Design a protein with these regions (language model features):
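Generic protein-terminus/edge-of-domain signal
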Residues: 1-63, 74, 82, 109, ...
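Solvent-exposed, amphipathic alpha-helical segments
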Residues: 49, 120-135, 175-186, 230, ...
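Short hydrophobic/aromatic patch on the recognition helix
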Residues: 65, 206-207, 211, 255-256, ...
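Ligand-binding loop in jelly-roll beta-barrel domains
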Residues: 73-97
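Double-stranded beta-helix
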Residues: 95-114
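Short, Lys/Arg-enriched, Trp-marked, Pro/Gly-tolerant hinge/linker segments that flank
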Residues: 108-119, 134-146, 152-200, 213-225
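Terminal helix-turn-helix DNA-binding modules in bacterial transcription factors
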Residues: 181, 190, 194, 212-257, ...
Length: 274
């Protein structure tokens, strides 16, 4: 008689679909990355030195061992700090799993063992990308599998670690947060610099100066990127272009098309087709 076994189905809370970039680089003391927004996850980890980073309205002062998550469609940038030439580990990846929601807006401080482990995962991801670029499909399939599984295991382990609380290090960072929060609340309509300055109790010149301290975009350009992030969300939920255009306060679908292409580089149809 065959013995009966009970099969316990496993659930994949985290599934890495693809690795997009993997960087291990020492940046110069005057390094300044102007910022970007994309529809996939990114992890920035300081291996040595210090760096400043923004993530939407939040400003972070990152030290050795700090690991910061950037969620999809989050505007973020990074630059050298405290006169150091920071060594940065960066991995960007696409994940199809509800478990990644846990890491939204999270900051961790890695001990030496975890920092070394993340550096090894970064190296594995870089090796996979190199094999892909060389056209070595056989070895790439194995190496990419190892890199993805390694990153998944690291994230599962990280979930058991205590996160590092966010805190604002300067008055200007708090004002920047206030400005961005106002722009996010106004994502369904147009705004002006004058209106935003009044709402934040600032002069127009002070508003622009403080905003430029933490973001390479102008106030209105940044507001448009917020609207496009909302547009991506609404279109992904199945709303039509005309419905999204109206909900976000655009005067016409034609203007919405222009704004969307300016922000993403492609039309709404091509964006979701890709």
């Amino acid at each position: 008689m065959l013995q009966k076994f009970e099969f316990h189905k496993t659930e994949r809370k985290i599934f890495i679909k693809s690795v997009i970039t993997a960087i291990d680089a020492v940046r110069p003391k005057d390094f300044y990355f102007p910022g970007e927004m994309h529809n996939f996850w990114e992890i920035v980890c300081v291996a040595e030195g210090a760096a400043m980073a923004t993530a939407d309205e939040r400003v972070y002062n990152l030290k050795k061992g700090n690991l910061l998550f950037h969620k999809p469609m989050e505007f973020h940038r990074v630059w050298s700090a405290e006169g150091t030439a920071p060594r940065l580990f960066i991995i960007s990846f696409e994940a199809e799993s509800d478990g990644m929601a846990y890491f939204r807006d999270r900051l961790f401080t890695l001990n030496d063992l975890l920092l070394e482990e993340f550096g090894g995962i970064n190296a594995a991801c870089r090796r996979a990308i190199e094999l892909f670029d060389k056209g070595d499909t056989s070895e790439y399939s194995w190496q990419s599998n190892a890199a993805a599984v390694g990153l998944e295991a690291f994230l599962l382990r990280l979930r058991g670690e205590k996160e590092t609380a966010y805190r604002e290090d300067s008055r200007y960072a708090a004002i920047y947060r206030q400005i961005v929060s106002y722009l996010e609340d106004a994502c369904c309509r147009s705004v002006t610099v004058e209106e935003t300055a009044r709402a934040c109790n600032l002069s127009c010149s002070s508003l622009k100066r403080i905003f430029r301290m933490f973001c390479d975009k102008g106030v209105i350009e940044y507001h448009n990127s917020i609207r496009m992030r909302m547009a991506v969300k609404l279109l992904g939920e199945g709303k039509s272009i005309s419905e999204v255009s109206e909900q976000l306060g655009f005067s016409s679908t034609s203007y919405f098309h222009i704004a969307f292409k300016r922000a993403t580089g492609v039309s709404p149809g091509k964006y979701f087709g890709a």
